[in-house]
Amino acid sequence: MKKDIHPKTFKATIRCHCGFEAQALSTKGELVQVEVCSNCHPFFTGKQRFLDTAGRIDRFRKKYANFEKKA
């Protein structure tokens, strides 16, 4: 077996922007910061955010309406 071919592992603290912290093994370093975790992600919390997709669809149709007329 070859020596020193495996990456070094650290006991890392994973920190979310919501303030949640967890401990895990990582090769990235001792502190890993994430934007979203299971504590604050809408899928896990049940708090869904609806985006204004109706306005986006209207803008898309208005922008590409001329292509439909020409074809």
From Swiss-Prot:
Cofactor detail note: Binds 1 zinc ion per subunit.
GO molecular function: metal ion binding; rRNA binding; structural constituent of ribosome
Cofactors (names): Zn(2+)
Gene Ontology CC, one term: ribosome
This protein's record includes keyword Translocase: no
Sites where the protein binds Zn(2+): C16, C18, C37, C40
Alphabetized InterPro entries for the sequence: Ribosomal_bL28/bL31-like_sf (IPR034704), Ribosomal_bL31 (IPR002150), Ribosomal_bL31_A (IPR027491), Ribosomal_bL31_sf (IPR042105)
Keyword rRNA-binding tagged: yes
GO biological process entries: translation
Alphabetized Gene3D superfamilies for the sequence: Ribosomal protein L31
Transmembrane segments: none
Keywords: Metal-binding, Ribonucleoprotein, Ribosomal protein, RNA-binding, rRNA-binding, Zinc
Membership in a protein family: Belongs to the bacterial ribosomal protein bL31 family. Type A subfamily.
Complexes and interactors: Part of the 50S ribosomal subunit.
Protein purpose: Binds the 23S rRNA.
Protein name in UniProt: Large ribosomal subunit protein bL31
Organism name: Solidesulfovibrio magneticus (strain ATCC 700980 / DSM 13731 / RS-1) (Desulfovibrio magneticus)
Gene: rpmE
